[in-house]
Amino acid sequence: MVDNMFIVFEGIDGSGKTTQSKLLAKKMDAFWTYEPSNSLVGKIIREILSGKTEVDNKTLALLFAADRIEHTKLIKEELKKRDVVCDRYLYSSIAYQSVAGVDENFIKSINRYALKPDIVFLLIVDIETALKRVKTKDIFEKKDFLKKVQDKYLELAEEYNFIVIDTTKKSVEEVHNEIIGYLKNIPH
């Protein structure tokens, strides 16, 4: 029996993760999912990110961890049947919340149950380009903050061996083909 793959896309808003994760899921006939999830906790997180409700950054980190517990159950169930492609996962929490001032070790400790992805694609982009691409504004979309988050993602890429793809000057098709090229070289 071939194990199904858990593939994660990370990057700041406007990097192309949602577009690319959906394209890949369609091509692979995989289950597509995202964080924050559709759980009750995920809906609360979206309220906070939209600026409708305010909470402490540590509280937000805990909410993301709680949402991830529920989400991981769904991912594990789907992996029994097919590949899973996820738009954001644990590394978004580490990048965004640590830049917002939450201790990185705290974030990692409350997420220690998280499923380890088989592969993580980090899509990076010029900050100006990202801001032009973004359709919805949330509390994290400030230029200097996004730069710090992307820098943190690049640190995580070193630590966790992400595949980094710069989407700034590439078409959707070029990025998709690059992703497919990487996947062809992975035993599956």
Swiss-Prot record:
Family listed: Belongs to the thymidylate kinase family.
Q: Which PROSITE patterns match?
A: THYMIDYLATE_KINASE
Q: Give start-end of the signal peptide.
A: none
Would you tell me the protein name for this molecule? Probable thymidylate kinase
In the UniProt record, does the keyword Oxidoreductase occur? no
Which residues take part in binding ATP?
Answer: 11-18
Enzyme Commission number(s) from the entry? 2.7.4.9
Q: Which GO terms describe its cellular component?
A: cytoplasm
InterPro entries, per the entry: P-loop_NTPase, Thymidylate_kin-like_dom, Thymidylate_kin_CS, Thymidylate_kinase
Q: Which GO terms describe its molecular function?
A: ATP binding; dTMP kinase activity
Record GO biological process: dTDP biosynthetic process; dTTP biosynthetic process; dUDP biosynthetic process
Asked if the keyword Nucleotide-binding belongs to this entry, the reply reads: yes
Write the record's keywords in alphabetical order, separated by commas.
Answer: ATP-binding, Kinase, Nucleotide biosynthesis, Nucleotide-binding, Transferase
Catalysed reaction(s) here are: dTMP + ATP = dTDP + ADP
